[in-house]
Amino acid sequence: MLPVLSSTPNRRILILMVRMTVLASGSKGNSTVVSSSRTRILVDAGVSCRELFKRMQAAGEDPRTLDAILVTHEHQDHIQGLSVTARKLGIPVYFTEATHRAWMRWITPRKRMTYAEWLAQRKQQAEMTAAPLNPEMDDREAFEEEQESESVEIRAGEIKAEEEKPKADPAALPRVEYFSAGEAFSVGDITVSPFTIPHDAADPVGFVLETEGVRIGLATDLGYMPAHASMRLRGCNVLVLESNHDLEMLRDGPYPWSVKQRVMSRVGHLSNDAAAEFLENSYDGQAAYIVLAHLSESNNLPELARIAAERALGGSMNLLANKILLATQDAPMESITL
């Protein structure tokens, strides 16, 4: 059931059920929106502001009603559109303090670079995060958007971009809120429970979002599934789980050996086999939907990820009525309503 949008453009919106939409998932950008009857939260803004708004509209979501952005960690594929989106909408951004500081260190020098220098740094960042860089995508657009904070055109009259100074501080946000892993907090009527995950970032976290009796767990960008994270994910109605790579494809693939080692390390990414091991041995079977996410376009195939998960669940899949879905890089996933 789709949400009923209010006639006024700002903030409030009536939603009949809790709704989750993965807008983008993969090495080139990640973003998910979770909505309750009173609150709408964006988890990560890993695509440009223009692309983010476009995908939200395609999914039937209204960007004007976003209440906050949560950040899992500071890697580019999770923060590309963060500053522009937050400023356009005038909404707070929630980080751990270490992630915020790492983000500021990374974004501030980049604004003072030429496009060539910025692109070289972006390629280096992409290699570090095992993200294939597509020169035909929106590199120039992303650079110009960050340099000028240009207006985002959605439809005439829908969103009026606020005037910004051409040389606005790239690290300036409308409001910054800090949280700590292990300590729950609330955004509107959504309770957010962050937990530490093993990844090569300053202070990476996963989230469990709970509202109206529904629990949504988000666990991507982790080298392995630690016991405390597994415990946090118990009782979730929706589980977004990383299934990044097929080990054989990664070993035989195009990445430099140093990047392959990083991806396979305990601070890298969860493989299909590792995700399947979690589902077989630690998953409690409570989720109506299991969303396999952050699939590598270079080192994985959707069907390989699906087959590994289905085999792990075995006969319990039909018994528990689990439904396995695949989040994609290029388009929003069909929304889940509960």
Give the residues covered by each predicted segment.
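Conserved beta-strand hairpin/beta-sheet module of binuclear metal-dependent hydrolase folds
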Residues: 11-59, 205-220, 238
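Active-site neighborhood of phospho(di)ester-bond hydrolases with catalytic His/Asp-centered motifs
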Residues: 43-46, 66-74, 95-97, 217-220, ...
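Active-site metal-binding motif and surrounding structural segment of the metallo-beta-lactamase
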Residues: 49-100
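Metal-dependent catalytic neighborhoods of phosphoester/phosphodiester hydrolases
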Residues: 80-89, 105-107, 300-307
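Metallo-beta-lactamase
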Residues: 98-205, 211-212
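Cap/insert and terminal regions of metallo-dependent hydrolase folds
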Residues: 227-327
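Short, basic/aromatic-enriched C-terminal tail that caps enzymatic domains
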Residues: 322-338
